[in-house]
């Protein structure tokens, strides 16, 4: 799998996946590690997914990059979330402020943790285009290393409004919802429609969508979520070049409508 600034370009999201199901988490996370996935994204918002992820990583913790979040309106609550994360994971490689919630207040103490080398990178996330102006404001402080945003053939606001800024500032980009939270893969194009993409290593529609995202070289990592242990290997295969050119990206866009 190709590597960019955050490691292998396909990670694993945990929103609406295994939750508190420890056995399913172990299967999905184990299959992901076996497939070369290294970045695992989670949040206190994800209904027990952090604890399940920690247990699933287990003895293979050294192979994983944990990208989790602080989702708290107060500093005290944020510090408590972080305390639990340290108990579960030992340290946090990428700590993100979820949906900009109290980001100025949380950033103060998180920067101290980064200075003490208990966190490698600090990030900020948001899912809504209406918040992209504030995301840009946060990035312009030059205090963040990573930004996480939605991007897929149906959600392209970031192309115009945000992706140029991280590229200018040297901020790494994580893409959430590369499959549109599953909506884009519910209808699969025909074999004939996908035929022009075979030369790029595409065997499935899901791979076409992931390769569409990663063919934008401003993107460092895509984090498709799954609760199916057979899926990580398929997703990881989409992280290999060659990448799409304008014609192939346009085809995927047409097939996504």
Identify the function of each model-found stretch:
Residues 12, 42, 68, 94-97, ...:
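Conserved beta-strand positions
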Residues 15, 45-48, 100, 127, ...:
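Flexible loop residues that form catalytic
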Residues 27-28, 52, 84, 109, ...:
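Alpha-helical elements of Rossmann-like donor-binding domains used by nucleotide-donor carbohydrate transfer enzymes
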Residues 53-56, 110, 135-138, 166, ...:
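Hydrophobic packing residues within well-ordered alpha-helices of enzyme cores
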